Structure formats: C-alpha cells, structure tokens
Amino acid sequence: MMVFQSFILGNLVSLCMKIINSVVVVGLYYGFLTTFSIGPSYLFLLRARVMDEGEEGTEKKVSATTGFIAGQLMMFISIYYAPLHLALGRPHTITVLALPYLLFHFFWNNHKHFFDYGSTTRNEMRNLRIQCVFLNNLIFQLFNHFILPSSMLARLVNIYMFRCNNKMLFVTSSFVGWLIGHILFMKWVGLVLVWIQQNNSIRSNVLIRSNKYKFLVSELRNSMARIFSILLFITCVYYLGRIPSPIFTKKLKGTSETGGTKQDQEVSTEEAPFPSLFSEEREDLDKIDEMEEIRVNGKDKINKDDEFHVRTYYNYKTVSENLDGNKENSNLEFFKIKKKEDHFLWFEKPFVTLVFDYKRWNRPNRYIKNEKIQNTVRNEMSQYFFYTCQSDGKERISFTYPPTLSTFFEMIQKNIPSFTREKTPSDQVSTYWRLINEEKKENLKKEFLNRIEALDKEWSVENILEKTTRFCHNETKKEYLPKIYDPFLHGVSRGRIKKLPQFQIITETYIKKNIEGSWINKIHGILMKMNSNKFEQTIEKFNIESLSIEKKLSFFSESQEEKINSEEEIKIFKFLFDVVITDSNDQTLIKNFMDFHEINKKVPRWSYKLISELEELEGENEENVTMEPGIRSRKAKRVVVFTDTEPHNEVYTKLKDLKDNQNSDQNDEMALIRYSHQSDFRRELIKGSMRSQRRKTVIWQFFQAKVHSPLFFDRIDKLFYFSFDIWGLKKEILRNFMWKNKKNQKIDKKDEEQSKIEEKRRIEISETWDSFLFAQIIRGYLLVTQSILRKYIILPLLIIIKNSVRMLLFQFPEWSEDLKDWKREMHVKCTYNGVQLSETEFPKNWLTDGIQIKILFPFYLKPWHKSKFQSFQKARLKKIKDKGEQNDFCFLTVWGMETELPFGSAQKKPSFFEPISKQLTKRIKKFKTKSFLVLRIFKERATIFLKVAKEIKNWFLKNFLFIKGKIKDLSKRNLISLFGPREIYELNETQKDSIMSNQMIHELSVQNKSMEWTNSSLSENKIKNLINRIKTISNQIEEISKEKQNLTNSCNKLRYDSKKMESSKKIWQTFKRKNTRLIRKSIFFVKFCIEQLSIAIFLGIINIPRITTQLFFESTKTILDKYIYKTEENGEKINNKKTTIYFISTIKNLISNSNKKKISYNLCSLSQAYVFYKISQIKVSHVSKFSKLKAVLEYNRCITSFFLKNQIKDFFQEQGIFHYKLKDKTLLNSEVNHWKNWLRSNYQYNLPQIAWARLGTQKWKKKINQDYLVLNPSLTNEDSYEKKKFDNYQKKSFFEADSLLNPKHNLKKDSIYNLFCYKSINSTEKIFDMSIGIARDNCLVSCFLEKYNIRGIGEIRHRKYLDWRILNFWVTKKVNSEPWVDTKNKKKYINTKVQNYQRIDKITKTGLANKKRNFFDWMGMNEEILNHRRKNFEFFFFPEFFLFSSTYKMKPWVIPIKLLLLNFNENINVNKKITGKKKGFIPSNEKKSLRFFNLNKEEKESAGQVELESDKEKKINPESALSNHEKNIEENYEESTIKKRKNKKQYKSNTEAELDLFLTRYSRFQLRWNSFFNQKILNNVKVYCLLVRLKNPNEIAISSIERGEMSLDILMIEKNFTFAKLMKKGILIIEPVRLSVQNDGQRIIYRTIGISLVHKNKHKINKRYKKKSYIEKKTIEKSITKYQNKTVNRKKNHYDFFVPENILSPKRRREFRILICFNLKKKNARDRNSRFNKNIQNLTTVLDTKKDLAKDKNNLIKFKSFLWPNFRLEDLACMNRYWFNTTNGNHFSMIRIHMYTRFPIH
C-alpha cells in the first residue's frame, strides 16, 4: 500500500512538473506578459471605448478591437515566419510606416470633414472612418512598445523558441495568453469607466467644483480627439528620436587609420550578404577591407557621381633611408577596371536593402582606439557563432562554430546543387565516432608502451621521437606532397614569409604578354557565378611563361622556396587548378579574372582612430586636429583664458639654448572647457550611429560619467563612488549636537532654496541664449553697443546735465570728481562663463561662443560728493557685511541694466533724486519742530495740570466717603471698652465668613426697621408683630454671640496646631503639583541627560588614542633617556656587578614570549657599526667587558676575518678578543634556500636559468617589485644587506634544520648575547654576490647621506587598485649624520655605489616574502639617530590586527596563513638622482633603485664627482648644501617646464607624467572638488586672468581682495603644488574605478605554478638532505639524466610519484587526457526521453563497481595531487582552442557556458 501511495505521489509530482514545463503553459505565461507592454495602439483602443457613442461608436469599438487583435496576431506569426520577422524587426520599418501615416492621421484629425464623402449607405465597411480605426490599431500594434519594452519579451520568446521543439504550439498558446490578458484588461477599463459614470459625486465634486470651470470641462470634452492626436504625435516623435533616418543620417568616411601599416584595400559598393562583427581567421587583422575614396595615380579624387570597382596592387620596394632619416613609403599603383553606368548609389541597391537593412553604414561596427586596443577588432577574439556540429558523436548546436566555415559551406550548397549531405541516423554516427576515438586511444596506448620500452632498452633518440603523418597522393610509389604544401605538417617545415615579393607594375602590355598562361582557381569557378560562354575551359600543359608568372605571383621568396621537379609541379597544379587559355584580344577574361581573383568576404569596418569633440577642443592630439571628430562628446566650449607670449623668469633666458628647434611664434595657451548645464544625452556616441542601440540606458544623475542599464543595478557594488571621511563626519555630528538652533536652520534653508531657484533661473537663461541659432551674435552686438552707449554717451551726458543744473542753482560744479569716477569705471570683456580678459581684448570666437561685459567700479551719478553715506550705500554695506563679501562690480545686460551675476535679476539703481528728497524732508522736519515747539510745551503742561486736579478731586471724594462710612459703623455697634483687658486671636477663614454673613443680616434688619417706621400708612398690628420679631431675633443674636465667644477662646489655644496642619496641607499640595510636573517633564530630562553623557563619552573615546600615544611616547622617551643615553654621563656610577643592557633585556623578554607563540624576531635591521658602537659605549671592567662577545666571535671564527671591517678587527686585536689572522672558512648558512631545494625536488620545475628568465621577464619582475607592500619607507628600518636570489628568510621555529633557536633551549643571558652578536655579524653575509659579481644595495651608506624620500608611499593601500589620495609627492629633506661615522669608509661606499648603480636592477626578487622583516624597532633608538617620528601610530600599537588584515585583503595569495598575524617590514629603496649633465630633474616615486639612464663613462664619472662634492659640502656646511640642492632642483624644474613649450605632451616633471599615464591608461575617473571650494577657485581664476593682462595690477588686486573676490588662502604660494597636496586638503578627490586590465601571460603562468607549490612553513625540511635516485632501475637512471640530482625528504610523502604520461609529448598528452574523459564504452542507443529500460542491472553489480572505485580512491587522490599543475599549465592554455575554437582564453565568457546545460551521455 505504501509503495502504491508513493507511486501515486511521484506520478503527481512528475505530472505537475510536466504541466509547468509544457509548451502551452509557458506560451500562456509569455502571452500574458505581453499584455503589459502598453503602446500607442492602446490609445486608439481606449479612445474608441471612451469617445465614440451611438451606433457608429459600437462599430468603431468592434473595428478597433479587431485591428488590435489582428496586429498582435501578426506579431506572433512573425516569430515563426522568418520573412515577416525580418520585415517587422528592422528599425526602419517604423520610420517608413510611421511618418506618412502619422501625417495622414494628424491632418485628418485636425480637419474633420476632409474625408467626409457623405455616403448614405448603411454598409459601414465603405465608411472610411471605420477603416481608419481598424488601420490605426493594426499598424500601431506592430510598432515597438515603450512603457515596458517589448524587446525584453522578444528575447525571452526567442530563447524559448530556440530550445522548444513544437514552435507552432508555443506561438498559438502565447497568442491565446495575450488574448486572455487583453480581454481582462479591457474589462477592467470598462468597469472603471462605468463606475465613474455611475458615481455622480466624483463627476460633480472632482471635475466641476465651481461654475468657473464648467466651460473648461465642456471644452475639454469637445477637444478630446485633438488631445488624443497630440498624444499620438508625442509618442511618434519619441519613436523617431530613437530611430535613425535613412536619408538624413551622417555618412561615415572610410578613412583608414592604422598607423602606417600596409593593407589590402578593396572598394565595393555592394552590401555584404553576411555582415559580421567578428574577425576573419587571418594572421594580420590590420588588413581590412574598407570603403574609402582613393586617389588614382596621384590625380584628383574620384567624383562622387562616379564609382569604380578598383583592385589595388602593391609595389613593394625595399625601404631606403634618406639623408634626413625619413623613410619612403611603398607606392600604391592602381588601374581602372570598370566604370559604373549608374550615377547614384540609391538606385543601385534594392528597396528592401535600403529600408530594412539595419546593419548599414551608419551603424558603428568598430572599436574606438585607446591605449589598450590598437586595432579595429582585437586579435584572436573568440567567435560566438551558432551552427550545427558533431559533439559526442551527435549533431549539436555549437555557439563557437567558425563563421567562415559555415559561410563557405553555404556558398558551396548554393552553387553545387548535387552537393547534399545524407543525414545518417544518430546511432551510426555515435558508433562511428566512438570507433574513431577508440582507435586513437589504442594508438596512443601503443605509443606509450613503445616509449616505455625504448626507455627500458636504452634505444636511440630516433626511435623515441614522435612520428609525423604525411599527405600521400600515390600509395604505390609512396610519393608525398612537398612539406611546404603538406596540410598535415605545421611549423617551420611549412616555410616562413620574411618579406613579400616585389610585384611589378601590371600594365596592359604585361597582361598581353602573359595572358596565355593565366590560371583560374577551380574553387572560384565553382563559387562565383560567371558566364561559361565567354571562355572555354581547357587543360593543357604548362609552358615556361606560365611558370615564370607563378614565381612572380608567389608569396614566397626564391631562397625559401624548395626546388620541386616539373612533374610534381604539374601534378600539384592539376590537382588545384584548371588552365584557361583564350584569345589575347578578348578583354572580358582579364576583367573577370581581376574581379574574382580571391575569395574574400567584405566585412564593413571603418576607421577606429576617432577623436572626440572634447579632444578637438583641447587640441591635445595635434596629429588628429585636422580630422573631423567622430565621437560626440558632452556639449562644451573651449575658453582660452591666458596666452603666454613673453618669458617671465630668468631661467627662461638662461636655458634658452637647451630648447631644440623650438618655435618662438608658438604661444602657450591656457584654456578651460566650459560644459553646458544640461543633461548629457550624447554619451560618447559615434556620429551617425543608431540611438536605439543605447535606448535601455538611463540617466539617473544630473551629470553621469557612466551610464548603466537598470537591469544591472544589482551588479553595482556602490551606486556612488565617494570617499568616506570619518573624522569629518564626527565633527559634523558633534556640531549638530552642540549647536542646534531650529530657527536659524529654517532661515538658512529658505535662503538656500531661494539661491538655488535663482541659480537655476540663471542657468536656464544662459542655456536658452546658447541653444538658439544666431542668438549669441545678436546678444554680443547688443552688449557691445550698450557698453559704448553707457561709457561714452549716456554717462557723460548725465554729468554735463548735473553740473549745468548746479551752476544754475548757484552751486559749485563737480566736474573733476565726476570725471574721476567716470574714468575709474572699467568695462572688462569676459568669456561667456565670466572669465575676465581685459578692456580691449575680446575673447576668441566671441560672436559664436558668447561674451559677458563686466563693469568694475560702476559709476553712479551723485547730486553732491561732500555728503555723507547715502541711504542706499548704507543698506548695501549692511548687506555686504551680512554676506561677508563686497562686490564692487556688476555685469551688463542686453537692456543696459546691471546684474550682480551673469543672467541674474536686474539690480535696482541708486536714485539720483532720492538724497535730494531726503534732504528736503529733513529740513522741513526741522522747521516744523522749531515752529510748533512752544505749542507742544503748553499743551503738554495743560494736560498735566488737568490730570493732577482730577486726581486730587477723586482722592478727596474717596477718603471722605470712607471716613463717613466708618463713623456710621462705629455708631451702630456697641462701644467696646478700649481700656479693659482682652484676648487677641486670629480668626480662621470659616469664622471670618460667618461674621461677614451676620453683619449682612444685621444691616438688613436695621434697614427694615427704619422702613417700617417711615411707612405711616401701615396698621398698628403689623407694627407690633414686627417689634416682637425684632426682639426675638436680637435675643437669638446675643445667644449666638456668646457661644461664638466661647469657641474663639478654645480656638485661640489650638492656634499653633491649626497653623501646622495648614502648612502641611500647603506643602502636600505643592508637592503634588511638582510631582505631576516632574512626571510630565521626566522624558525630556532623561533625553537631555543621555545626550550629555553620550557627548562626554564620545569626546573621551576620541581623546583616548591621542592621550595614550602621548603618554606612551613620553614614557618610552623617558626610559630611553634614563637607561640608554645617560650611560655615558653616569658611567662612573655603574657598579662592577653583572650589568644588563636594557634594550637587550627587552629583546630577551620579547624572544621568550615569542618562543611560546613560535615567533622569533629578526634583529637584522641593525647595522654592524651601530651594534659595536653601542657595545663599546658600555664602560665596565676589561674582564667582563667583552667576555660574552669573545665567546661568540671565537665560536664563529670563520666569520670574523671575512666579514668584519679593518678598524673593528684592529680594535678587537688590541683588546685581545681574538687573533687577527684567521683562516677564511665558508660559513655554514643556517638559512638554506628551502624553496629552491623544494623546487628542485619536484623534477618538472627543475628548469635551467634561461627557462626561469623566460618565465619571469624583466618587465614582469619590475611589476612584481612595484607591487610590494611598504610599511615604513623611512630610514629607521632599512636593511644594511641584500638577500640572495630566490632566498627567503623565514622564522627559525618553523624548521627543524635551524637549531640555533630551539624551543626547548633555555634563553639565558649568554645565549642572548650570542644571538645578538651572531645576528649582527651574520646580517650582511657576503659583500659581493658571486653569481652576479656586483655590490649589493649598500643601504648603510644611505643612512648617512642626504636622502630625498617620497612620503606616504609606506601607507597601507586599502584597495586592490591604486588610490592616489594616499601618495604624497612632495619631497622632504633628511640630513642624517653622526660624529662617529668614518668619512673614508663613506667615500669608499659612495664610489662603489655609483659604479654599480646601473647593475643593481639585475638583482631579482621572487615575491613579497623575500623582504619579510620583523617590525621591531629596537625601542626607537634608530629613530633617535634620525630624529624622525613615526607617522602612523596605529602601526606601532596594533600591527597584528591592522597591517596584515589589509594586506591579506589585497593579496590573499601572497601571505601564508601562519604569517597572517606576524609583523614584517619591507623597504623600497628610493635613491635620489642628482643630474650632472643630464637634462631635467626626475623625482621618481615608483622605481626601486634608480639608474643613470643612457650615460656614457664620462657622464658616469661626472655624476659620481657631483655626488662626492655634494657630500663634502654637506660635511662642511649642511645648510649651504641643502640650499644649493634646492637651487639645483629649481633650475632643473624650470628647465623641464620650458620643455613643455616645445611639445604639449611633455609634462613638468616625471611625477606628473606618471600620474597622467596612470589616469589615462589604467583608470576611468572623475575629478571633483568640494562644493565650498568651487566658487572661490573660480573667482580666483577670473581675477588672475584679468591681473595677468594689466600693466599695473596693484590697484585691481587690492580692490579684488577687499571685495572678497580673490581669497588669499587659496593663492598657490608654493611652486610645486602637486596633486597630493590638493587631495590632502580635500580640494581634489580622485576616485579611480576598477577596470578589467589584461594580465600578463608570464605572470599568469607563474601564479599557476605558485598555486600548486606547498609553502615551506607547512612543508618541514630536515636538517640534512639525502640524495636518492629517481627510479630504482639502472637503465632508466641513465636515460633520465635531469632527474639524478633530485633531493627528497627523509620521510616519504605523496609528492614523489612518477607520472607516466609525461613520457608522451605535450600534444599527445593532452589528447590522451581528453580521450580518457570521454565515455567510450559500448552503450545502447535509445531515445533521450525514454525513462524505463528493461535491461536494468542488478543492485549487486552496481555495489561491486562502487567498491572497486573505493579501492583506488586514495591512489587516485595522490595521483591527481601531482597531475594538477600539469593540467593547469597546459590545459588552461589550450582547452579553449581545442574544444571551443577560441584562441584566447581571456575573452572566453563563462556566462555562455552556464546558459546551456551539459548534454547527457547515454
């Protein structure tokens, strides 16, 4: 039951998978997707649904829907039907269909009655409107869609069509899917429209809110057709923007620019039948068929109306050099063949080719030349071409099939109808293929066995070598083809072409003479269509003349051709050619012969040396300036800022004679490129190319250097390439925390927004002026006329009028003051961008490029000059103070107005009459104040008197009434005895209230009584009753008063307690109020506390590193001063006890700690002299002074005499440490080169020295050396020796052979001293390397010389590409001299260094590990010598976590795993170069050791003398030497700057040249500076341009500084202001983006070997080596001589296996491996889709095979571990060519492999 359930479940899953992967479901899915590609056809469909109503409207809806569906059906049919697909898939189809139909439809909509025939029939098919609706929906459905591009869907459809078998089912199902989606979409649109119609509230509220808009809405409804036509027009214009017009496109000239190489050029006007972008399989790809105009025999050019078929022949001559050194180019000789009868190209081509061929001449089938790509198409480019071929014995589609082969096959099929291929069944093909491969495999096995047998029996070399196959054309006689013509041979045997033969000029006499022996290729006769009646094919014998022609037409020289018998020649040419002999008078044969002389496929390619418009503006490519730019750059203009015509320095005159052939008339121009402030839609497109090729690109920034497709946004690592400044961010965060002011922020935001709006408006105005034709000319003339009118007409006229009016008013005129101000006004001509030139000089091309006129010190007419600051000036100064700037200038507008900025809003001029009116108002005010002063005083006093009288009166009345009321109250109450005793108490609030209420009652009673008495009309009974009532009330009052009196006595006693309760109540109430307030404000209080705490903590964290580094350095400095440097002064106080040298004790601690971690520090960084100098400074007794040193030196006697200097030997002999004359013995080198021995142990890497030199060339070694990681380039850690070649110093604890530092050895003081002295002596090993014979890099000398070092190179690179922000290119001086240095030795070292300078580069370094040093600085003592502090403190504190992690990120293949957390130091020696007679100073930043380039012996000696003299000067007076050297540098620098005038491509210094080379060749970059700096720099540039042209620039300079126009902090005071300084200050930020750089082949090979090598840290090598033979057999030992001296380890490992396949040749070895990979066993051929087969093996047999595989698993692993390097080296280089027909692995795309699954082997 369970089995049945699982079976059912498996069937369900398989059924679901089949349904999902079925053709119908996929077609429905793709069809449903195409519904969402909404295009212009939907506009017509919606218009028919929305607009048309009534009976005609329904018919229009039906016709629109029918046309819509029919158009989509045609699109789907075009997928299956190739001709329709070709017709509709071309871009020009849209042009041809859209333009006339668009015009027709547009005019028809605008003129409604244009096609109204007024037919009364009911047959609506005759109505033209319904037909047009049908056509609209049909035609526009065929166009490309624009909202969701249909090209993406078309690609998906094409991919599935490529893989699908049942294509028609897929097309129908996709159409059904589209139909379903379309019906659903239209139903949804209909429901939305119905809902809008039914919902009246939407129509009333949304559309018509008031009566104002009812008219507009009605008009909108009436003009709906017009709106739809406008939308249609916009969409069609959008299409035409992407589509090139077939008529108005730019025709490209076919000028060939290949750098002077000779080419086979052929002119043809016919289009290539199979245009392709890929290169033909030729040796030289510079030989290209191109379309160009040709000069015939040095005459005039061919007319455009006349076209010729021209065949070019070269007259190759030997190149002869003239006296001038120029070479004569080879002359081309041409002759006419045929003149075309048609005059126009357009009528020659068929209409289909003209309209529908999208691969026509205006398509950019070419590459743009740059430094990396020199040719049109790269050599050896892989060719992706789909065609059927046999793979695994079956017909497969290969995407790397040679296109030339397929083209040739198609041509044969067309011309030879009998040529048909019988389709053999797959079973037969597979068996045939299997048999062939089995035969090949057996042959290889036989060859393999024969080779082993030959080695075993010691046969001769002839029997071992591989046999070659020859082409035999006669088996009986065993006659073979000559080696030159044998296709099975290759290499030298086929011959070499040294130079092409010299063709004679082919004339008519030459053709008539040799016409009888003309040969025509048989293959040409098959392929080319020609009239067979024109000549008769006959085969005759060859005569002598024909053989002579063969020699002339041969491509091989006579010396290289092998001698062939006449019989063999006849047989060969019978096999290849038919001889055609015709009448010599018939000229048709000659023409036909010349027409089809060769098979060639014309691929349209054009010139690739195109220059962009930007390069034309810059004028850098002087050679190509005459060319018309072929690449459209961003819209820009070249603005010449400054033209240097005169020399400005003395150095120019001094070094004038150094300039060779300098043109004095040539002027240096400094120009700027002004870009237009608009989006760049050109995007480096080639002129005439199709914009539709790049329509998927999206500009998502205002200005974008690289345009990406939205499909690849996920591939971009960073959308924005910017530098992340952490410290700047911290400062900004702190500033925002500490200085928050919302009001100021709001005001600043408003100001910024306003300024942005104004800036945008200005840019728009400038761009509009620049965009219109002739607008700049009109504007320029208007500005010049306004300037002349203002300066010479309007302002003088105003001055005259003003002064004449002053004279009429009897005032003094102000002629002098006004004329002075008028003369001060300057009208400076500026460029369109605002760069100032001068008053008289107009900018270059100012009529076309534009002009600005800047008015400096503008003249304002004043009524008088002696007045104070006027109001407008005060307001203006106030504004200027707020802004922090003063702008005493303005720009002139076209209308004569003034603006602060070009194209800005007009400024309000100060009024002439405003100060006059203000003065008049002031005087009127003064008169008014004087005349009405008395009246004001009287009025004020009268009002005061009346107020006082009123107040007195009111006060008197109030007091009188109050006294009267009090008297009445006293009279009413009982008199209280004033003199009797009484208790005074305080009443509480309740008592007071009761008393007040009693008083009120009492008063009421009294009033009632008086009223009763006065009323005499009342009866007496009532009076009596009232009297009784009053009595009772009075009695009650008395009783109540008595009771209250008792209560008051008791209350008086408890007064204190009641007060206390009252106060406690008040406190509680206040506490409650405070508590609620606290609860409400507690959140803000907590936030405030957290902010304060976070600020404090953050500031503390920031200051921790600074404090710790400061404390640490202070402590180390004090320790050093205390324990080391005061030893000389306090030497007398040192006891005679056992002394400890502090820096050696620290070494002891460090080594003991490092021994636990298996790390030992390298002490080689100390120089020998320094060690002995420090030891000699210790003042102790003679016995203990050198006891430890003596033991060490006696232990290593072989070292002392060989290594120590003579002075130290003499000193040691005097002290009695060791004998002077000791025998020289070879030192046991404890640091054996294990890596080299390991390489020798593996025989396949035991290469000779020549092979190693080929493996890594000098260029490659230089590249490797340049990639070194430098930690500290200063002299503190530079080494005083150089290692051997291929010698790597490693940590001692990793090897058992190095027994000096054993982990079990106790590190005592004696061993420390021994180690110290041994390392110091052993550090330099040998002064001279015996293998090379030159002195090593004497870094000791560099410690005492003045060194010019490049700062910043030692900083760690955090990226895998070069970051120029790290490098600092300025030079720092270091004078390093000590009194204990011997000058004699110094001079000797200098001499040797200069002599061997040019040979130092021969010392090769194998890799990064060669320069590993422990980063141990001897507690900074070397730094004390140089007085130089460390730059980066983080290196000193956390080297384990910082340095090597970043190094491992950049080069993970270099650093071993065990060394990842260790320190090493690597130094690059940058030696200075003092030029003697050589021109120019070159401060290098990348060379490891500089040489004297191209110097002869005299110059070398002079250079050495210069260096020695400079050293002497430094010894005597270091400051003067430094100053002299500075002058030296300045002179050389000036000399190099003058060289720039000769050629613009020369740079100021080598640093700039290298930087420019880096930026142009290896990086695409963007330069930008900070926004706050931008305007300041531009303002400075503008002022500089004006000051340069003025004779007396002082006044303008001072005024510009006062105005704030020129900022002094940006002035370039330094001469050498390099890029590094700009980058450090944040002005310029260069951010290179990584590019794909083509790796060096030698480097790839070396890295491939390096992967297979086991690192020697993991590969332990024993102390002693044992030599073993490679194989035990004696016979093989003799034959394999190169494996005899192989050293192996004592322990047997898996790397010693013998590889049998290496006996085979490399070619057979590769073939053998590939044949092994194929499964060539017998197999039953069955259908691929059949899942069940009856012949199923049992389970036991399968398990047995698995067991067999498991047995050989270990052996297989061992075998593969040794085979892997061989596979890597050979297969990677040859696999692509062998399998995929690709000749270069770099261009092979792995994506294309992943697109197609592997084919299963059945």
Swiss-Prot record:
It is found in: Plastid, Chloroplast inner membrane. Keywords: Chloroplast, Membrane, Plastid, Plastid inner membrane, Protein transport, Transmembrane, Transmembrane helix, Transport. The chain crosses the membrane at residues 19-39, 68-88, 91-111, 133-153, 176-196, 227-247. InterPro entries: TIC214. It is a multi-pass membrane protein. GO terms for cellular component: chloroplast inner membrane. Its main location: plastid. Signal peptide: none annotated. One of its GO terms (biological process) is protein transport. Involved in protein precursor import into chloroplasts. May be part of an intermediate translocation complex acting as a protein-conducting channel at the inner envelope. There is a partial copy of the N-terminus (positions 1-343) of ycf1 in the inverted repeat (BAF50686). Part of the Tic complex. Belongs to the TIC214 family. This is Protein TIC 214.
